[in-house]
Amino acid sequence: KKCMKTLLWLDDYRNPMEDDWLNFSPIGKDVEVVWVKSFNEFVDYLNKPIPLPDAICFDHDLGEEKTGMDAAKYLVNLCNNLRLKLPKFNSQSSNPVGRENIMSYLENYKKISSTKSYY
């Protein structure tokens, strides 16, 4: 039995198991979903002594000061410092500017980091 891939779902509101939200998953719908609802929960999950998730879906507006963009920056710093490959990613945010910022930030890091030998 193959291991299920893990999708980390960052969203304060949308339940990833409802409606068609898993259409946003960059690794398909046959996934184990971990739903975190805040920046702090996101950070706590990434700091566990387990491998990074296979993919992460970002919401932008989390109903608090910290946004999905802060989470994206945290992820990039973590991957950069620990020389880890960036998980696949997408954003289900209904904030078009926030969504674009997160996606282009992560795409840019992916481009830069792919030139490094450990990627």
Residue spans of the language-model regions?
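Catalytic phosphate/metal-binding cores of nucleic-acid and nucleotide-processing enzymes, i.e., regions
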Residues: 3-119
